[in-house]
Amino acid sequence: MKLETLAIHAGFSPDPTTKAVAVPIYQTTSFAFDDTQHGADLFDLKVAGNIYSRIMNPTNDVLEQRMAALEGGVGALAVASGMAAITYAIQTVAEAGDNIVSVAKLYGGTYNLLAHTLPRMGIQTRFAAHDDVAALEGLIDARTKAVFCESIGNPAGNIVDIAALAEAAHRHGVPLIVDNTVATPVLCRPFEHGADIVVHSLTKYIGGHGTSIGGIVIDAGTFPWADNKERFALLNTPDPSYHGVTYTEAFGPAAFIGRCRVVPLRNMGAALSPFNAFLILQGLETLALRMERHTENALKVAHYLQAHEQVAWVKYAGLPDHPEHQLAQRYTGGKPASILSFGIKGGQVAGARFIDALQLVVRLVNIGDAKSLACHPASTTHRQLNDEELEKAGVPRDMVRLSIGIEHSDDIIADLAQALEASRG
């Protein structure tokens, strides 16, 4: 099936008992066992079924199946946020003493997780420029458990050469984890370019309406975990915390996502509410239509800003003069979502005047909403970074980030025009 159809139908058919066509909300903590043996078999992973909503839930299962189908994966795990998804994806394969290699241009929360939080747990991150694959590859050693990148960077809007990075990682027997939040599977499917694990913040374009926080981890099911038992011992040796199960034996190609569910999620508990899963599923049904309008509007806004005398610079990979325009053509069909950034003449002071003058575009730090949104990253999402870190992340202090919505483009541009005029002071 095509993506547009999968987004509506994958993972669910009318309920056999009630004949309900919409996905039901299974708002329950627990699920009954047929008998003692059934309960034991569920806990031993011998049979499929529901145990407890911290680990699995039928509403969440539909979302997981649907997202796995859209990305082309073997399985998925829905969790409470995109940050939980990234954390659990890393913790599934890495432990104290290990490291991951990551591009430096990242969402501020992700950078903070990798640079400051995970090191306190003994997992180090080694950063290099997103466009220097050789430098990234050079950081991989025997304790590297994954390479990490964003398909489209937030907020910089940079495009990563996924195929080249995947090849570099695979030369060393290491998987590539790609955060595909900004691109969504409508614009880019990282597994088709060699990625092994995909994560999303479902809060953004997937949900699409700013109503629900959620995240997901998706497993391609193609990485040969069992071929390197020493590097990936967590997947290849008996786990004393879960009845001595060996995940590559119990789950086969889905070993990664199996361990992700029964270790990080089960033990740390960032479970997605079934109600949030239901709301995200509603948004997912219109994802393809919305992305078409998002990208169309973003290109119009980018052209408008580029021609405005009050604008110092514009970064949007959909513009022909962007240094990564060819990568945008290759990986997103020339439609690199609707996150763009620009600088206003007059620096941070003028930028603040611009933000304060907006009337239609909403001042907040989310992206991927049906509504157009604006923020000043250096004072919000990336506030915790020092000047050196801001430079590495591609976030100058005069940057304004726009997430272009699906309103009429004329109205978006009219609001930007009056705010730019106000920025003059």
What are these regions (language model features)?
Residues 48, 74, 276, 280, ...:
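Short amphipathic alpha-helical segments
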Residues 30, 35-87, 109-117:
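Conserved N-terminal alpha-helix of the aminotransferase class I/II PLP-enzyme fold
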Residues 218, 341-343, 403-405:
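Short hydrophobic/aromatic beta-strand micro-patches
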Residues 268-271, 275-277, 286, 291-293, ...:
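Conserved small-domain helix->loop->beta segment predominantly found in fold-type I
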Residues 1-47, 425:
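N-terminal glycine-rich, Lys/His-bearing helix-loop that initiates the first secondary-structure elements
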Residues 7-16, 76-307:
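Conserved PLP-enzyme active-site core in the AAT-like
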Residues 1, 115, 124, 142, ...:
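PLP-dependent enzyme catalytic core of the Aspartate aminotransferase-like
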Residues 152, 181-183, 319, 345, ...:
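Active-site beta-loop-alpha junctions enriched in small/polar residues
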